[in-house]
A protein has these predicted regions:
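Active-site-adjacent substrate/metal-binding segments within catalytic domains
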Residues: 60-92, 98-119, 124-127, 179-188, ...
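Short flexible loop/turn segments that cap and initiate beta-strands
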Residues: 46-49, 219-227, 264-270, 666-668, ...
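Conserved structural position at the C-terminal beta-strand
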Residues: 152, 275, 715, 757, ...
Length: 836
């Protein structure tokens, strides 16, 4: 019975760590690190005096803790970087080492150019800040005290076109294992076929690492078995097989009544591989008789992918449109160290909007994000890099402003690209959400750095700036095709179950190279005008919008063309870096803002994408007759906006004549809806007649005189029945704060608290910029207050923050057991508290 309990405990550990580590006993190694910002040449040595270093837990991003400055680079969000050291003291007893003699350290991500030492010995270097990697600590491990030291060199501050963060910004794992164990990332599966009777056959590859067994490895192989078991979502065994353990074994499992993974019902099986000794195949069903040596558990999703140049993309045999968004890896005030709970809320908000895919822009991201996409039903385009052998421009004085810098990752490309790409594919290949591997983003951007004579051809049909014509001194674009072939070959050597793609910025230039032919599916960035031209010119090419704007026309180019299977909108959320001139935290192109609140453009996108009824209204002043005539016959606001905020208070027109009176203001009310028609009511009375959907611009609008009260839009079917509605109200003066915990059911450690400034009737005061302070008692810490204002350059780590549009979100991490009270206050407003 004791052995049975131990086996269950082992399984529980694996369920927690399965997507990060695929062997041994893994435990998070995040607590009790020491940190020093600055270089210390002797900090790798175990006896180095670190008594004055800062105590912290990882994940940790030191850049987000720094002071924003207009003297720093705009591309990385006007935030500092530098060199930092981490040290961790830990103890392993003789019993620990005897029971599991091998010890490894696994980092999910360190930005960047890391060096890892154990007891003064270099374990390895990894320059890429986005890949996950494992080091064997066994040769240098000591009984008793040990010191792990990590040097992080982010001294090249402007080394990216967006904010990267600095430090050990993802989870760390300590892995202890027997001398013979399952190989890291060595258990994988692939769907062999779906059968007509509803069953499925899957092939499972299992790699075993015998390297530490030395000369005894052959004998040990003969004495060991692999037991492979597939269980359904309810834990019932549906397939099992056993075989002798070898360095690599392939088994086929037959799955009756196979349930498919899809976007609405992302069904996941669990595959458990157990390496055991002293048993036979006949004892597989008797867990108490198995002497388990190692075990791994992975999620399994059964789905088919089909791509066609004329029909687009089919998931499980059903042709569909990919409604994707591009995502960078930060979360505003939290920087790059993003808690799981924040990712959960972000992905759920995007899915609620109608998005069904995420492009990992432009690098492998945190493993937890792929897990969420598996469980929530989101397709993923996994991307390797943004830069190859030569640097791209990095704007330091504002996006596309001034003189660029040229730091980057190019200097380690040649040495590391094969391994970096291979590690991305090996780490992520078991995720059913992944349907595309990308070799890179915009590596063919004209003259940044590659050039080609075709750029002298006048209208090259490239929508982005070319910075002049052909530059003979620049690297020739023919190199792109050769490198793409190399990277694609690495991917295909590991996984052939998904196609290889790339995101092309200069399609016309790349068409003169081998690049499009080196990949299976060709992504077009902002080049919708080439969809039909190239479909006719290259009839075997599979085309989609790998990066597009949020405009209606870009979506119609996908919706109305069968051969274009989807788009990835830039971007799903606002992100730090790639900033404009100061003040600008980042690029606010998101459908969601920094705090993961849906923006007007997000509502517009929901009206285009969602299968659920959607209606939204926003308003802009067209004119005040006294002071807003431009003198040329046009009136301010005489356009239809996809960015209209949901405000219904008297607009302010600052000018020498003062504010216009309510009866002199004409408001343009815009409605985003997926209903066939909509009408507008003010205080219960019809003020906007029923209007049909406008397929030219995708927006319905009315011009009405402003009057306070409740404005309501109703999206209706053709019979006039209300399908969905949206109301906005005139708010009064701020009187109180209102608190709401967001997604409490998904909270493990980090609580997300919505703080709203409200009037006496509970309406959010959207004009409020009240400075809100947060004070905590009990075992918890404030990670940050996110107001989502892109021009607010105040300290990210203060305990107070101005509200933006009358709200902010607070991130509070529990650090221990016991009651926690979080109090929010602002001048002349009633405070509020929340306990948990």
């Amino acid at each position: 019975m004791q052995r049975f309990l131990l086996t269950l405990l082992w399984l529980a550990l694996w369920c927690n760590a399965q997507s990060q580590v695929s062997f041994g006993k893994a435990e998070r190694f995040n607590d009790d690190w020491l940190f020093h910002l600055g270089d210390e040449p002797k900090a790798s040595q175990p006896k180095f005096d670190d008594a004055q270093w800062r105590h912290l837990d990882v994940p940790h991003d030191w850049s987000i803790e720094g002071q924003l400055s207009k003297d720093l680079a705009s591309c990385t969000g006007y935030l500092p970087a530098g060199i930092g050291w981490y040290r961790k003291h830990f103890v392993l007893s003789a019993q620990d080492i005897a029971s599991l003699p091998l010890s490894y350290i696994y980092f999910e991500g360190i930005y960047n150019r890391s060096e890892v030492y154990l007891n003064g010995h270099l374990l390895g270097k990894r320059p890429n800040g986005y890949v996950s990697f494992l080091y064997d600590m066994t040769p240098y491990l000591r009984k008793g005290d040990n010191v792990l030291a990590v040097r992080v060199d982010h001294s090249r501050i402007a080394d990216s076109r967006w904010y990267t963060g600095s430090g050990i910004y993802r989870d760390v794992w300590l892995v202890r294992a027997p001398k013979v164990h399952l190989a890291q990332w060595g258990t994988t599966y692939r769907l062999k076929q779906m059968n007509e009777d509803g069953s499925a056959d899957i092939e499972v590859d299992v790699a075993v690492d015998f390297s530490a067994a030395g000369k005894k490895s052959t004998k040990k192989q003969a004495a060991m078995m692999l037991n492979v078991t597939l269980r359904d979502a309810e834990g019932r065994k549906v397939a099992a097989k056993a075989c002798e353990a070898r360095e690599l074994q392939t088994l086929t499992l037959h799955v009756p009544d196979a349930k498919r993974w899809d976007l609405k019902h992302p069904y996941l099986y669990k595959l458990t591989v157990e390496l055991s000794a002293g048993n036979t195949i006949d004892t597989i069903d008797s867990i108490e008789t198995i002497h388990s040596i190692d075990q791994a558990t992975i999620n399994v999703g059964l789905r088919t992918l089909q791509f066609d140049p004329d029909h687009g993309f089919a998931l499980n045999g059903k042709w569909m449109k990919v409604k994707g968004v591009c995502l960078h890896h930060d979360a505003g005030v939290l920087g790059a160290a993003v808690p799981r709970e924040v990712w959960v809320r972000r992905v759920k908000e995007l899915k609620r909007m109608g998005a069904n895919a995420i492009r990992m822009s432009h690098n492998p991201q945190a493993p937890v994000l792929y897990d969420l996409c598996d469980s929530l039903g989101m397709l993923v385009m996994d991307e390797g890099s943004d830069e190859w052998e030569f640097p791209k421009r990095k704007w330091v004085e504002g996006w596309n402003q001034g003189t660029p810098a040229y730091d980057g990752s190019y200097d380690f490309f040649e040495e590391w690209i094969d391994r970096d790409v291979a590690d991305m594919v090996r780490r992520d290949r078991n995720h059913p959400c992944i349907f595309l591997w990308s070799v890179g983003n915009e590596v063919d951007y004209p003259n940044d750095p590659y050039s080609h004579p075709v750029l002298d051809g006048g209208n090259a049909a490239i929508n982005q700036p070319m910075f002049g014509g052909y530059k003979p001194d620049a690297p020739h674009a023919e190199r792109i095709g050769k490198i793409a072939k190399r990277i694609a070959a690495v991917i295909r050597s590991i996984d052939t179950s998904r196609p290889v793609t790339g995101a092309l910025a200069g399609v016309v230039m790349s068409n003169e190279t081998e690049y499009p032919e080196a990949i299976d599916v060709v992504g077009y960035n902002y080049t919708e005008n080439r969809y039909d031209i190239d479909h006719e010119k290259y009839p075997r090419r599979i085309i989609y919008g790998s990066e597009t704007g949020v405009g209606y026309d870009a979506w119609k180019a996908v919706r109305d063309k069968e051969h274009i299977f989807g788009q990835f909108v830039w971007t799903g959320t606002d992100y730090l870096g790639e900033s404009g001139r100061w003040p600008s935290r980042g690029l606010n192109t998101g459908l969601l803002d920094f705090g993961n609140f849906k923006k007007p453009r997000g509502w517009f996108r929901a009206a285009l994408w969602s299968e659920e009824p959607v209606t939204y209204i926003g308003a802009n002043p067209i004119t005040s007759p006294r002071n807003n005539n431009r003198g040329d016959g046009r009136r301010r606001g005489n356009f239809v906006s996809a960015e209209a905020q949901d405000d219904w208070n008297l607009p302010v027109f600052p000018n020498r004549q003062g504010q216009a009176s309510a009866d002199s203001v004409i408001m343009r009310v815009v409605c985003y809806t997926n209903a066939p028609q909509a009408r507008l009511l003010l205080n219960g009375s019809l003020v906007g007649e029923m209007k049909p959907q406008n397929d030219t611009i995708g927006i319905i609008h009315w011009d009405i005189p402003y009057a306070p009260g409740t404005l309501r839009a109703e999206g209706c079917d053709l019979q006039g029945n209300v399908l969905s509605a949206y109301e906005i109200k005139t708010h009064g003066e701020a009187t109180a704060l209102r608190l709401t915990e967001l997604l409490p059911e998904d909270c493990e450690e980090v609580h997300q608290i919505l703080v709203e400034v409200v009037d006496k009737d509970g309406n959010r005061v959207k004009s409020s910029q009240a400075d809100i302070a947060c004070d905590i008692t009990g075992p918890a810490v404030l990670l940050g207050l996110e107001g989502s204002n892109n021009t607010d350059m105040s300290d990210y780590r203060d305990n107070h923050q101005p509200a933006y549009r009358g709200r902010l979100v607070a991130y509070v991490r529990r650090t221990g057991t016991g009651p926690v009270s979080v109090r929010f206050s602002a001048a002349d407003i009633q405070a509020a508290s929340m306990a948990f």
